[in-house]
A protein has these predicted regions:
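Short, ordered loop/turn segments at secondary-structure junctions
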Residues: 1, 45, 65, 144-146
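Conserved PLP-dependent catalytic core of the aminotransferase class-I/II
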Residues: 66, 70-138
């Protein structure tokens, strides 16, 4: 949620008004903050120093490449003043959720730009992701052991850069492939 939720993109703690009561915040750099790799943990100096000394994942991990760190810093600067982008992103996500639900897809409820489309069967999720790619729509299928058995899904991940025309094209592809695979009527 860092970069998307909360004032200035400050994430879930800010969104729910509990930022002052959270000891540690961890987040990814793989979504709003540059779309690359890696992540971060932030908190009081004493806690971070303890983690630096005692956390095996930290001790045995390589540092982020400087270019990734620079991209994340630039992304943070952009999202701090990007409330208009977040508003547009949430509007686009709401519109897309509405369109997919109207087609008959089962969605995990929420008000965020990551939209899980529940399919249940792992082979259907894989096949649908492959077919959507053939239609020019890149999505990721998830199945066991990433999610519980019987809860396979496709995950859509929106960006503030997606246009309405692109989303309309995605909806059309979902309709075509969903009907072809008998996921929707």
């Amino acid at each position: 949620a860092t970069g998307v939720l909360g004032k200035g993109g400050r994430g879930t703690p800010d969104h729910f008004g509990v930022a002052g009561r959270i000891d540690l915040v961890t987040s990814t750099l793989g979504k709003a903050l540059g779309g690359a790799a890696g992540g971060f943990t932030t908190g009081r100096k004493e806690l971070i120093e303890l983690l630096r000394q005692r956390s095996r994942p930290y001790l045995f991990s390589n540092s982020l490449p400087p270019v990734i760190a620079a991209a994340a810093l630039k992304a943070i600067a952009l999202v701090e003043h990007g409330d208009h982008l977040r508003v547009n992103l949430m509007e686009q996500a709401g519109w897309l959720r509405g369109q997919l639900a109207a087609l008959g897809f089962t969605l995990v409820p929420g008000h965020h730009p990551i939209i899980p489309v529940m399919l249940g069967d792992a082979s259907i999720a894989t096949h649908m992701a492959d077919r959507l790619l053939q239609e020019g729509i890149y999505v990721v299928g998830f199945s066991y052991p990433v999610v519980p058995k019987g809860q396979a899904r496709i995950r859509l991940q929106l960006s503030a850069a997606h246009t309405r025309a692109q989303l309309e094209r995605a909806v059309a592809a979902f309709a075509t492939v969903g009907r072809e695979l008998h996921v929707i009527k």
